[in-house]
Structure formats: structure tokens, C-alpha cells
Amino acid sequence: MTYNQPNNQGFYGQFGGQFVPETLMTAVKELEVAYEDSKKDPVFQAELKELLKDYVGRENPLYFAKRLTEYAGGAKIYLKREDLNHTGAHKINNALGQVLLAKKMGKNKVIAETGAGQHGVATATAAALFGMECTIYMGEEDVKRQSLNVFRMELLGAKVHSVTDGSRVLKDAVNAALRAWVAQVEDTHYVMGSVLGPHPFPQIVRDYQAIIGQEARAQFLEKENKLPDALVACVGGGSNSMGLFYPFVNDESVEMYGVEAAGLGIDTPHHAATITKGRPGVLHGTLMDVLQDENGQILEAFSISAGLDYPGIGPEHSYFNAVGRAKYVDITDEEALEGFKILSRTEGIIPALESSHAIAYAVKLAKELGSEKTMIVCLSGRGDKDVVQVKERLEAEKEVK
């Protein structure tokens, strides 16, 4: 049966929907119409395609990681090199699409939330390209962890709002951005950074990120003359993973593994393993798996990686998990740091801490699958933004050899 989600109410099975105040419903409906129109607009599609090619640098390589494969001692590991995009991560695929859409809708301002700062940088980049005013909401904790990205955003002309509410991380930045959108919905588009939020955001972000899997599928077929046995990608909100998974959804032989952040361990309160430890609830306008206590209060998510410490997961991921189309696993901070070092030393590629979770799991999975099998890992971003943090962490552990 061909996969066809979401339904026309924006649900993926029981997940998804539009749980927003009346004040935002008009904006959400307007966005739905504009997005559907843009899909049928050849001028819009041609402009986006040209930007992805000439500005972002697509298509990026599908790279056979020979030494990583030898290190793991099992399945062949291919890396989809989203780290080579302009701005250094997959985030630009979506930011460009949405800012172009905002321009088409006649908006002259964009706002966005950011965790690691990559989506903020990508949105500020796209706003600069189109000459639009840009405001980024970022939790105070993340502002401290990612000061370099804060400077990048300001350099690109964006205003960065440090959010001091709650636990001062990504979920609080989303809250602040949604509040700001309500207040200025007439001339402003909210550039959602992941497959989250009320419909049509999860679908829009998925569709703009699906270029990852579309390219990877064609590239893999060309190299191996068959489909891969497995796909591996890290999952915070879940946009790089959904971008890789979605074009393979009807290929039943291809297994999909979403790698969540186990932080200090899933048996501690300090993790972001939403599928493993969460249950369905409404957050930020959508019904999805959420980390919550017995009273339904949202718990704080924790990860060494600022891009993964979100207490929810995109509704389509919740659906994939519920129907068994994808498996969701977890990797601790320690294992991710090991992945960070392994890829750097075997391939000369320094990955983002987010992507390091996927690398760490891929090494485990490759051993399990054996040398006859193949996999694609989404290298969602480069590690420049994390080098100082990792340096401090490893020096504290006196582990730099």
C-alpha cells in the first residue's frame, strides 16, 4: 500500500493535528493554502531548485566511509554529506524553502526558534539573501553553549532574543517564538525548524528536507545497484531523519533507525529519549510523543547536543514508531563523544554532536548486520560549532591523548 500521510486534517494516524489558539488558526490555514499553491507553481519550484543547486551546493555527495566501515567491522557505511551544505548542516534545505514561501505570501519579516543555532543561522542566512527582517528566539542556556552561532546570526543581520523562561532551552524558545508570531501574524512568517508544530509545518519541513533521501536513494542505486538495508539518522525534533526516511517509506526492505539522545542514560532524568520514555501529549500545537510526568507536565530534556534536547518528536515519527515502520534507539553523551572522535580519526570528518549520535549507533548496527549488508547514515551537520565544547569536556575528563 502506498504511504499517504498526513490526512487532510493534518493527522498521521492519531498524531499531528492543529492544536493552536484561534488567533493563530487563520495564519496556519493561510500557510496551508500558500504551501499547496507553491507545490503547483513552476516558477516557485524552479527558483527553489536553482537556489538549492547554486547557493546551497546540492547535490551533496553520498560518501563510502571505507575506514569507518573497517573500524566497525561489518556493514558498508555510506554517509549522506549534509555537513557540506552552505551553513554546514541540513537546516538550510528547509529554511530556504520556507523563507521563499514567506516572500511569495507577501510577508517581510521572519522569526524562528533555534537550539544548537544551526536553524537560526540558516534562517538568518535565507533572510539576508531575500532582504527580510529576521528575529531568532534562543534559550539562554543555548546562547551560552553556542555563542559562536549567536555571533553568526547577528553578523547576518538577525536579532537574537535570549529566552529566560522555563529551562531556557529549545522548547522555551519555541514557546517564545509562537507567542511572538501571534502578536505579528499579519506581516511575519514563523520558520519552524523541525517536523514539529501544528499542521502544515511537519509536512512542509518534511517535504523540504526530503531532498536528502531523494538524492541518497538515487546515488545509492547508482553506486550499489540496489537499495540499502538500513538508514540511520539522529532525531531531536526529527527533520534530518524524516528527510532521509520519507523517500524510502514504501521500500519495505529498507529498515529505518532514528537515534535519540540518551544523555546521561535513559534510567536517569537527564535524557531526551522521547519515543523510549515519552507518551502521547500535546505540545507546540501538535499531538506527538512527549516527555512528561504523571500530571502531564512537560519534563526537561537533556543532551550534550543542543540540537537534540527537545522533549517532543515530530508526529510523523510517533506514527512511524506506532506502526513499526521505523525503530527508535538511543545513544548516550559518552557514546556520542566516542562517535565524534571515531569519525574524526577514521575519515578526517569532524561531525556535529547531533550527527555523532547517528555515527555511534551506526558502528554498533554495522557489527550486528554483518559485512553483506549496507547502510546510509545522515551526516546532518559539521562539528565546527561543537569543537570548543568537546575540547572543554575532554580536557575536564583529561582524555585528550
From Swiss-Prot:
A Pfam family this protein belongs to? PALP
Pathway(s) per entry: Amino-acid biosynthesis; L-tryptophan biosynthesis; L-tryptophan from chorismate: step 5/5
Q: Which SUPFAM superfamilies match?
A: Tryptophan synthase beta subunit-like PLP-dependent enzymes (SSF53686)
Required cofactor(s)? pyridoxal 5'-phosphate
Entry keyword annotation includes tRNA-binding: no
Q: What are the GO cellular component annotations?
A: cytoplasm
Mark the residues carrying the PTM N6-(pyridoxal phosphate)lysine: 91
CDD domains assigned: Trp-synth_B
EC number(s)? 4.2.1.20
Q: What class of enzyme is it?
A: lyase
InterPro entries from the UniProt entry: Trp_synth_b_CS, Trp_synth_beta, Trp_synth_beta/beta-like, TrpB-like_PALP, TrpB-like_PALP_sf
Reaction equations catalysed:
(1S,2R)-1-C-(indol-3-yl)glycerol 3-phosphate + L-serine = D-glyceraldehyde 3-phosphate + L-tryptophan + H2O
Record-level Gene Ontology MF annotations: tryptophan synthase activity
Which key words tag this protein in UniProt? Amino-acid biosynthesis, Aromatic amino acid biosynthesis, Lyase, Pyridoxal phosphate, Tryptophan biosynthesis
Q: What does this protein do?
A: The beta subunit is responsible for the synthesis of L-tryptophan from indole and L-serine.
This protein's assembly is summarised as: Tetramer of two alpha and two beta chains.
The text of the family note is: Belongs to the TrpB family.
Q: What is this protein called?
A: Tryptophan synthase beta chain
Which species expresses this protein natively? Lactococcus lactis subsp. cremoris (strain MG1363)
- Gene name, Swiss-Prot/TrEMBL: trpB
